Amino acid sequence: MAARSLGSGVGRLLRGLQGRSGQSGWSLSVSRSTATRLPGCVPAAAQPGSYPALSAQAAQEPAAFWGPLARDTLVWDTPYHTVWDCDFRTGKIGWFLGGQLNVSVNCLDQHVQKSPETIALIWERDEPGTEVRITYRELLETTCRLANTLKRHGVHRGDRVAIYMPVSPLAVAAMLACARIGAIHTVVFAGFSAESLAGRINDAKCKAVITFNQGLRGGRVVELKKIVDEAVKSCPTVQHVLVAHRTDTKVPMGSLDIPLEQEMAKEAPVCTPESMSSEDMLFMLYTSGSTGTPKGLVHTQAGYLLYAAMTHKLVFDYQPGDVFGCVADIGWITGHSYVVYGPLCNGATTVLFESTPVYPDAGRYWETVQRLKINQFYGAPTAVRLLLKYGDAWVKKYDRSSLRTLGSVGEPINHEAWEWLHKVVGDGRCTLVDTWWQTETGGICIAPRPSEDGAEILPGMAMRPFFGIVPVLMDEKGNVLEGGDVSGALCISQAWPGMARTIYGDHQRFVDAYFRAYPGYYFTGDGAHRTEGGYYQITGRMDDVINISGHRLGTAEIEDAMADHPAVPETAVIGYPHDIKGEAAFAFIVLKDNISDENMVVNELKLSVATKIAKYAVPDQILVVKRLPKTRSGKVMRRLLRKIITSRGQDLGDTTTLEDPSVITEILSAFQKYEEQRAATN
């Protein structure tokens, strides 16, 4: 059944473009003939200002669409002279060239000038009922004190700063403080191991690290400072570690360590913002690829901020005075775009959720919605599937009448979870937006909203491209698939302001990863289906990347984490469907002949993955096999391993390139015994 609601954001966009300052006189008229030239582009409607007309305008005339939006939405120090200069063949991406601005001014100062006591942040701390509200004035003062502290300790424009902190006002201030002085932040999820943290610090050549003594999550204490201490032992570029206190517990302070709150208290609550060029780096965020090394994706100033703000406003139908509740961690791109930068640029009240969906019980989300009167709720399908199993009573116990929009992010949402979220959580009245985007895209690219008024929303489908996003489906030979009811590799044919600009220190890797497979197009790595109606449904990853609870992870990373074990000469990791996580990791390992205690090795491998990457990366299942299925050239055929565990070896497809086809029977037999043993112990 389709859910319906007004696509009111589109009308407001048009009115804003035509009348915000009385300066915008550009036309939205679009000819039907030009709008149909781009594959996947929605045909233009006769009505100016309709979703099809705006969508076609953004696709056909990017400068005319984005130029006025950037001019009127953002606060500029110096106007830009060129809206865009992009070439996907070389990975060249530039927006609003010649312009200068400061992101923190756009997120803080402009709102403080108008309404300083408006609530910027509601910190929903780990213990329910202990929320803290921070005004825009308070957040600006905290940001300036932190910015001055960084400068006093030698952090300046262009320096990199690692932030290893859980969701908190001080973490947000740390991000904005970096933006204010022109430093580049790289937030590392505060669940990553010391080794993963060190790898990111070293790749970015960070001068400073900002952290807490400890973190609190789900009633547990997380020893953040200990992890940082271990990490910086191998990080020669780190000159200072700024340590704040989340708990009263004292931690050892070494020669690099600086007590952050004490130092901030000495500083003035005013800091002159650096004027940054539109294409200066704002932040780096590390994400997994199909190879083993995480890549530091670079996002820049103006284009990213504009795109985050516009998608936040239009996809979620954000209106002034709303309380926006995105429960993502700031260590991921969702937290960057829809906890911090998008909402704050729009002057919104944004919720910082420190806890878990089931602490102290399975009603935590909905009790928070009731208490904080949240209007938009944005979370991951993994959490929805988990809470679904606890039943409806935990939801219905609380008043959710404040909710207008529900959002899903991180992975495709299955039909059952979509229906439960819509009917039970949203009482069948809330708009539900299943959003597709990536760390690389900077913001939402495909979602049911914005749309024309009253447009349908279909369960489990991302549906409509955002303005300026022109999806294209490719077949295996690199040909563009036209029309509806087709499936292929999801590409985007045109640049948009929010997309990443490069991989830090390795632009060729950026080009190879995203623009080489289909020259002239951005390749997302995902597959998609386009319906007869022109709607898009994401079908999942097409490369060796798995999505565990909304966290993208390369199988090669897990394999690398296990490769150092002296008893394990070979490993192969694949993803498989999981009821709660969406996907989980399944590892096949080959042991040396003299190993007698398989269980001990398996446990050691799990510990190794948790230590080198994070606990969420640990394979749910590990199967010992005598050998792996390889081609004559030595390549492991992971496709066959996936077939073995998902369909018991049925429909294996072409196996003629296998060096020894009998390996399939061998692994099938081992898997069957493994399953029997698991069934007997459960």
Curated annotation (Swiss-Prot):
Protein name per Swiss-Prot or TrEMBL: Acetyl-coenzyme A synthetase 2-like, mitochondrial
Modified residues (N6-acetyllysine): K389, K635
Notes on activation and inhibition: Inhibited by acetylation at Lys-635 and activated by deacetylation mediated by the deacetylase SIRT3.
Classification via InterPro entries: Ac_CoA_lig, ACAS_N, AMP-bd_C, AMP-bd_C_sf, AMP-binding_CS, AMP-dep_synth/lig_dom, ANL_N_sf
Source organism of this protein record: Mus musculus (Mouse)
Function summary: Catalyzes the synthesis of acetyl-CoA from short-chain fatty acids. Acetate is the preferred substrate. Can also utilize propionate with a much lower affinity. Provides acetyl-CoA that is utilized mainly for oxidation under ketogenic conditions. Involved in thermogenesis under ketogenic conditions, using acetate as a vital fuel when carbohydrate availability is insufficient.
Location within or outside the cell: Mitochondrion matrix
UniProt induction comment: By fasting.
EC id: 6.2.1.1, 6.2.1.17
GO molecular function per UniProt: acetate-CoA ligase activity; AMP binding; ATP binding; propionate-CoA ligase activity
This protein's encoding gene: Acss1
Transit peptide: 1-38
Pfam families reported in the protein's UniProt record: ACAS_N, AMP-binding, AMP-binding_C
GO biological process: acetate biosynthetic process; acetyl-CoA biosynthetic process; acetyl-CoA biosynthetic process from acetate; propionate biosynthetic process
EC class of the enzyme, as a word: ligase
Keyword set includes Disulfide bond: no
Principal localisation: mitochondrion
Residues at which ATP binds: G410, E411, P412, D434, T435, W436, W437, Q438, T439, D526, R541, R552
Binding site for CoA: R217, G218, G219, R220, T334, S549
Tissue and organ expression note: Highly expressed in heart, testis, kidney, skeletal muscle, lung and spleen. Detected at low levels in brain.
Quaternary organization: Interacts with SIRT3.
Residues forming coiled coils: none
Keywords: Acetylation, ATP-binding, Ligase, Lipid metabolism, Mitochondrion, Nucleotide-binding, Transit peptide
Lineage: Eukaryota, Metazoa, Chordata, Craniata, Vertebrata
Recorded phenotype for the gene knockout or disruption: No visible phenotype at birth, but exhibit significant growth retardation at the time of weaning. Attain normal size and weight when fed normally. Exhibit hypothermia and hypoglycemia when fed high-fat, low-carbohydrate diet, leading to 50% mortality. Display strongly reduced whole-body acetate oxidation when fasting. Fasting adults exhibit hypothermia, reduced capacity to sustain running and low ATP levels.
Post-translational modifications reported in the UniProt record: Reversibly acetylated at Lys-635. The acetyl-CoA synthase activity is inhibited by acetylation and activated by deacetylation mediated by the deacetylase SIRT3.
